[in-house]
């Protein structure tokens, strides 16, 4: 069975030619999220890694919610940081608040050269229904 692609009403289109999420065999793959305001996508990004991490995770929660899922459905996360050495600890502090208790998905975190709109962080994930 081919994947199902989700374009979610009320959310801005992706900055790339992609869907908000794709689903196959009970797995939901979220397109990378960053710190833009989903209700005002042209607004400036928040300042600093803490604020951008909060917004990024809130965006993930919103996309998952539109699909009937929660953060507890997440099995795997990939985090991309443009200032890895500088921002890793601060990002982790915010991240840990969103994945408290038993919800501890597998995670990869890498440093990258650049992200869309000069974002400091981008996160994508795989969730399971």
Give the location of each predicted region.
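N-terminal presequence-like segments and the immediate start of the first folded domain
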Residues: 1-75, 81-129
